[in-house]
Amino acid sequence: MFWIVLIVILLLALAGLFFVRAQSEREWMREVSAWQEKKGEKQAELPEIKDGMPDFPELALMLFHAVKTAVYWLFVGVVRFCRNYLAHESEPDRPVPPASANRADVPTASDGYSDSGNGTEEAETEEAEAAEEEAADTEDIATAVIDNRRIPFDRSIAEGLMPSESEISPVRPVFKEITLEEATRALNSAALRETKKRYIDAFEKNETAVPKVRVSDTPMEGLQIIGLDDPVLQRTYSRMFDADKEAFSESADYGFEPYFEKQHPSAFSAVKAENARNAPFRRHAGQGKGQAEAKSPDVSQGQSVSDGTAVRDARRRVSVNLKEPNKATVSAEARISRLIPESRTVVGKRDVEMPSETENVFTETVSSVGYGGPVYDETADIHIEEPAAPDAWVVEPPEVPKVPMPAIDIPPPPPVSEIYNRTYEPPAGFEQVQRSRIAETDHLADDVLNGGWQEETAAIANDGSEGVAERSSGQYLSETEAFGHDSQAVCPFENVPSERPSRRASDTEADEGAFQSEETGAVSEHLPTTDLLLPPLFNPGATQTEEELLENSITIEEKLAEFKVKVKVVDSYSGPVITRYEIEPDVGVRGNSVLNLEKDLARSLGVASIRVVETILGKTCMGLELPNPKRQMIRLSEIFNSPEFAESKSKLTLALGQDITGQPVVTDLGKAPHLLVAGTTGSGKSVGVNAMILSMLFKAAPEDVRMIMIDPKMLELSIYEGIPHLLAPVVTDMKLAANALNWCVNEMEKRYRLMSFMGVRNLAGFNQKIAEAAARGEKIGNPFSLTPDNPEPLEKLPFIVVVVDEFADLMMTAGKKIEELIARLAQKARAAGIHLILATQRPSVDVITGLIKANIPTRIAFQVSSKIDSRTILDQMGAENLLGQGDMLFLPPGTAYPQRVHGAFASDEEVHRVVEYLKQFGEPDYVDDILSGGMSDDLLGISRSGDGETDPMYDEAVSVVLKTRKASISGVQRALRIGYNRAARLIDQMEAEGIVSAPEHNGNRTILVPLDNA
């Protein structure tokens, strides 16, 4: 009957709601019609009622609450009916609860029916209401369990679950001997668990005095323990449990598992007191994830790790928990360890014997819980990761007895003859002969010349060489034997042992700048010093710590693992600009797979670019070069002050910068022997060229090195105008640049003829011959002089360095001819002492041709825009991933593996200081024929050497050109009635003679011979 009435009421409520809805619609329709009539609009333009009617949130909310209430009571009624029906069917003879047995004053059913019907009905009503309330409580708990909800904490339920103290049977621990570290860790863990249990008991019983906790029942004799009654620990525990009480008072609820046992409310099972007391800790462990069951703590978080992999895993967990605190699950053990920071070390300075962790006596297990409680089966074991106590005594091994070293019997040196101790004066000419052998023997000639020859003479006595002793007493080689074409000079101290290690023959041959004359020694005093440069600058904030390197290594492994490429970072090197991480691919992983992920890895790591080094010399791993967050400034003075630059003997030493580890990088242009520099605009190419020029100015005097500078941009190299090292003014016109290169070719031919006449193989040998003759007071005449009766004497020839700042512009002006001149210089100019430094910002195949690349093996690539440009310069990729601002790849001669170098910065202020300093010591000695295209008189017999025999019609062709003042191949061809090839050879011969200029960009040539001389 009740349900019928409830359903009728619900239907009436729905009908009332619909009626109110219809009334509202009619009212709204009436208002809209009135408004439209006022506006004069048509009725057909009215919107639809259902689409335009305003919403009534109050009606919807009322309807929702009414339906929800009806469904709830309907569900509760069905559940109660099913419960009562199943209870009566399954347990027909259920005993009467004890509470109803004590009702002596309640009349029976028969008495009440016969005597007083009203009393019986009231008793039955009270009993039914009590049963319904009890069933409602049961259904609420069941509904909460099914819906995975929380119910408020009821202390009476917890007290009912607690058994008496007599039911708890203590377990005696079994002790065994363990190490000090294990004892410290086990003692801490056991003490914390015991403390937790005792304080929970005291908290629930409202006790003020907390009993003391012992670590074990039977401790070892003489064991010194810091007990839990220590004042410091007591204050810590008081603060901890005050905070814990507030947490319990604010939110005290249980978490239930989704499983529910259907039992009678009066059927309870035995539960251990520890489980009921520790239930709040399990509740907090499962509360973070919003689940009903309490998760067991993560054992891996408490383990003590020592290897690299475990350390990296721990770092990852820490970083994830710091970044996402809302997603991390905080276990009960972690919460307790945070609340008790002072109680981590409770052991003294003695060995402790404690039960191991496998025999833990504090294992707590709940088997079953009645009346809808959870079924737990977990271990509440607290593990705290702590090292051994810092003040614990460690048993040291016995000291190793010291064994006295046996005495070594060293025989005394043999006596030295008096002949080697007497003062000796070398004869005349010995100093010059000794100087002539410096470049070949490389002995300590300076010590001999300065008076230190007595020590070396005394050392000869140990070898017993009488022949050398005789030569040291005055029997020297004659000057004819020391200098001549038929025999080679022998150094008198050739067999004397030297304190320095002997140099290789290749180094001696290539070190063309080691020779110095007497005049050079005087001029070298005026070389610039590093005081003209800015001091080195170091930024401590740009260095990376070991922790950052380790974190980056872990990130690299993780990011590559995301792309299914498993690698291992084995080492890292941090430099001023980049950091190289050496990775070892796993078995079966190809290096090309890492190379293909270059851009993806850079994007994943958040850096601008990454350079993958496929092969590292001397190692079996690959390299990943990542840019540093901040880069160091590398000053040029830092490279000049390094031992690598200061101890270099070559006059053509170039300071490049620092490598990836911060070590200075220098190279010798004489061994290069030519250098090709390429890079895009803004990559640091011009600054690198300035650093190279300053390196040679700091090393060589004008008598040793002369320069020809070609600067099409008229900005970079023009600041060197006026220094004494220049052979000609800085060339800014490309027409004159072709003449300068043509002069260099003629100078190369001249030097080759002179070296061939002198019988030497390089410029250093030629200068030695000149020095030897000057030491004897002789002069060697020029064999190719125009005045054979009175030839001019030969002088020392300096090195010539041709610097071209923009090679592409020079190629565009006179491409084919310039390419031929550059190729000839690159092929043959090394032995003649002429070296090239070519720089360009357009590294394309039409500028850097194959003929030029084949003759210039030493190359420097700054940042380029594409892989094609990198292949054009280095014949391999990599330059497109550079960082710019001086970051370069240096390809040394004789190797195919480029070296990454960070170029040194040379400011304009430093360059101006050095230039002004050099201008103080004299004006430059320019050679006029360099830019005019003419030649010196002594080269008239040399200039035609490349053409073999002279053409019989050459004089006629010259006459035709001078008369017509037109140097064209077609004009000579028509005038002399010859073929095109022969006429072209005649014009080229005139160009070599300096009669006509090189062809311009339009092909025209200029007559260089004045009209008066025609």
From Swiss-Prot:
Residues 298-307 have a biased composition (Polar residues). PANTHER family: DNA TRANSLOCASE FTSK, SPORULATION PROTEIN RELATED. Residues 89-142, 283-318, 487-525 are annotated as: Disordered. Consists of an N-terminal domain, which is sufficient for the localization to the septal ring and is required for cell division, followed by a linker domain, and a C-terminal domain, which forms the translocation motor involved in chromosome segregation. The C-terminal domain can be further subdivided into alpha, beta and gamma subdomains. The alpha and beta subdomains multimerise to produce a hexameric ring, contain the nucleotide binding motif and form the DNA pump. Gene3D superfamilies: 3.30.980.40, P-loop containing nucleotide triphosphate hydrolases, Winged helix-like DNA-binding domain superfamily/Winged helix DNA-binding domain. Homohexamer. Forms a ring that surrounds DNA. One of its GO terms (biological process) is cell division. It is a single-pass membrane protein. This is DNA translocase FtsK 2. It comes from Neisseria meningitidis serogroup A / serotype 4A (strain DSM 15465 / Z2491). Essential cell division protein that coordinates cell division and chromosome segregation. The N-terminus is involved in assembly of the cell-division machinery. The C-terminus functions as a DNA motor that moves dsDNA in an ATP-dependent manner towards the dif recombination site, which is located within the replication terminus region. Translocation stops specifically at Xer-dif sites, where FtsK interacts with the Xer recombinase, allowing activation of chromosome unlinking by recombination. FtsK orienting polar sequences (KOPS) guide the direction of DNA translocation. The lineage of its organism: Bacteria, Pseudomonadati, Pseudomonadota, Betaproteobacteria, Neisseriales. PROSITE patterns: FTSK. Belongs to the FtsK/SpoIIIE/SftA family. The keyword Cell inner membrane applies. It is found in: Cell inner membrane. ATP binds at residues 682-687. The keyword Lyase does not apply. GO terms for cellular component: plasma membrane. The chain crosses the membrane at residues 1-21. GO terms for molecular function: ATP binding; DNA binding.
